[in-house]
């Protein structure tokens, strides 16, 4: 709630339909299992509804409906864009820079991932114990990255920026400046 109180101070709560640039904010209606695109109404409500990460941030109730992060159903909503001239995608679920076991890695492949799992389960005492959070977090990012890659392949994009999912973790809002700097590196 502290972060969202700060968000209210930073973002002027304008009506989306009155903005100079047309935008669509994607969220997920968790009550009715459907994707919702918000194109009008309160900017704050739309942003708040779209960033409720399941298990970490409670759903946002708006007009009696509970909303969670739009990425649950559509992590890279290219298909919902208002303006489709030159599409620059920013995929926040890119391949991690480290393996689940802390080793630096280049672009991850499923073969590398399964080899890591094989190594882990082969009684190697040097590997760290994977907790349920680690496994769940990485699994969700793998799913979202695959869905994002499918969207990129399907649409004509101008530039694709793939940010490794381990640049930051959910709720590391205090790292905003560092995260923006990291993102700028991937844009070049």
Task: Show which residues each predicted segment covers.
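Short beta-strand-initiation
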Residues: 20-23, 55, 73-76
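A short acidic-Thr-Gly-centered motif at the start of a beta-strand
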Residues: 18, 55-64
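Non-catalytic peripheral regions of patatin-like phospholipases
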Residues: 1-10, 28-42, 65, 71-188
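Short, conserved, surface-exposed binding loops centered on an aromatic residue
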Residues: 17, 59, 78-82
